[in-house]
Amino acid sequence: MSISVFNRCWSKVILETLVRQGVAHFCIAPGSRSTPLTLEAIRLQDSHRVTCHTHFDERGLGFFALGLAKVSKKPVAVIVTSGTAAANLYPAIIEARQTGVNLIVLTADRPPELIECGANQAIVQPHMYADYPVASVNLPRPSQDYSADWLISRLEQACYQQARQPGVVHVNVPFAEPLYEASETDIEAHSWLVPIQRWLNQHKPWIQQQTDQKEVLMHANWDHWRTMRGVIVVGRLPVEQTMGIMAWANTMGWIALTDVQSSVEASLPYADIWLANQTVKQKLLQADIVIQFGSGFISKRVNQFLAAFKQEYWIVEQSTGLIDPNHHAHTRFNAKVHHWLRAHPPLRQKPWLLEPLALSKFCASFIEKQVGGNLNEASLAHHLDRILSNNGVLFLGNSLFVRLVDALAKLPEGYPVYTNRGASGIDGLLATAAGIGIGANQPLVAMIGDVSALYDINSLALFKKVTQPTIIFVINNNGGAIFDMLPVEADVKEKYYRMPHHLEFSQLVQTFDLKYARPYTWADLGAVLKVAYSRRETTLIEIKVGASDASTIYKRLIEQISYAVIGE
């Protein structure tokens, strides 16, 4: 038996299984040991069944796959070779686990006899991602001692676990040499594939799993609770689950606090600012019940309110993981939000508290005055809706800017907003944005901090592959301006936290052959955007701002609103 031929047969069954579980994208890094998997992915692409994406940097590739999976809402597979290539996927795997995004990571490996004996590029890869995968499959070296149906069943079981608890599946695949020179004729004719030939021809899963989605039942005491004073908080959710939330809350007369990641147009915007007012916060704490939809709230003051609330607490979230860092005694509904809303009809009532509405309206004009008419970080966040296309998507990085947007912006209803707020790292943000833009095939605006952009600068190469107008804003405040919020001595903060880099991005962008602009005014920006939206390519727009301008405005807003007196 030719080892190279059977390596391909083994890989064929692996990839055919994944395609039947919904995988339509394979993200591939260069490497020799992963050759059998890579060649099978190419075969699937040649038959127009999948799309292959490539990148030379495994860390960026993992985050690119994460972006694809976020926007497609289907599992995306990643193929890498052995050694530290596999280790470089770890940050993306952590983020996928924390946010319930489905990745299937295929790590090629050396065979067992080459592990822990000094062989080149050989590390211990089984369970290398610890508990972050929802399922780990450590395959043996390809061998006819294992039937093809065993291999299919083993992989399908892992995918079924992923369907029940979204996250990462890790499949470690050792291959012995030789890895090359296997003819397609020999692969197709191999006797090991004969028992599954019907399955190969039908393009259906081996095991027909029946979904166990249960009908959402009305809470036994809903007729009581819907007459009470309530607050809903809406966090990170798929757009399709958010339809009807605000109409439901408004009918109930309940207060609604919405995170920018929810894609819900806030009826009480700027909550991160007006919740700094202790008088209004204390009145809000008089609510009888809080219902949390989704998770991952950005606002510090929303999180402080939730931590202080001690009455009835419900959580509605499709996933099964814990999503309450305040550890309330609560009622949990494992359900899609729109299904839960249908099962819990609202009762029409007048608003039970008017001060939040009055303070929110006051904030709208107050913020406008404070951010001013200049093009700066705060005004860009406040007027973010001005720069978005009608049919596009938005990605927000993990800098000070995402907090400013959550606090100061009011985005259109249902506008798709994506973030990496699971572990909230600054790694892989450009790569994630590229995956979202290419996966959505819509105009993309990505807002990234300067340090985040420098950290992931390799991923600018991915933006050469876009086919829609793509705009990357780099907010360059010369270092980690978010650390200006810390109570640390100024000289220590500057040297050990902010770490000014004194770099600009014009030359870096030229290296990657992307368009570049640096507007100084809103009029400049308008002209730049008009051109950028007319091109099916990437434009990087650098906004240079003072190191502490935005944090100063932000802190001033919080301080002044905290003393505001608003009557009913």
UniProtKB/Swiss-Prot annotation:
Cross-referenced InterPro entries: MenaQ_synth_MenD, MenD_middle, THDP-binding, Thiamin_PyroP_enz_TPP-bd_dom, TPP_enzyme_TPP-bd
GO MF entry, a single one: manganese ion binding
Catalytically driven reaction(s): isochorismate + 2-oxoglutarate + H(+) = 5-enolpyruvoyl-6-hydroxy-2-succinyl-cyclohex-3-ene-1-carboxylate + CO2
Cofactor binding mode and count: Binds 1 thiamine pyrophosphate per subunit.
PANTHER family: 2-SUCCINYL-5-ENOLPYRUVYL-6-HYDROXY-3-CYCLOHEXENE-1-CARBOXYLATE SYNTHASE (PTHR42916), PROTEIN PHYLLO, CHLOROPLASTIC (PTHR42916:SF1)
Function: Catalyzes the thiamine diphosphate-dependent decarboxylation of 2-oxoglutarate and the subsequent addition of the resulting succinic semialdehyde-thiamine pyrophosphate anion to isochorismate to yield 2-succinyl-5-enolpyruvyl-6-hydroxy-3-cyclohexene-1-carboxylate (SEPHCHC).
Protein name: 2-succinyl-5-enolpyruvyl-6-hydroxy-3-cyclohexene-1-carboxylate synthase
Top-level taxonomy: Bacteria, Pseudomonadati, Pseudomonadota, Gammaproteobacteria, Pasteurellales
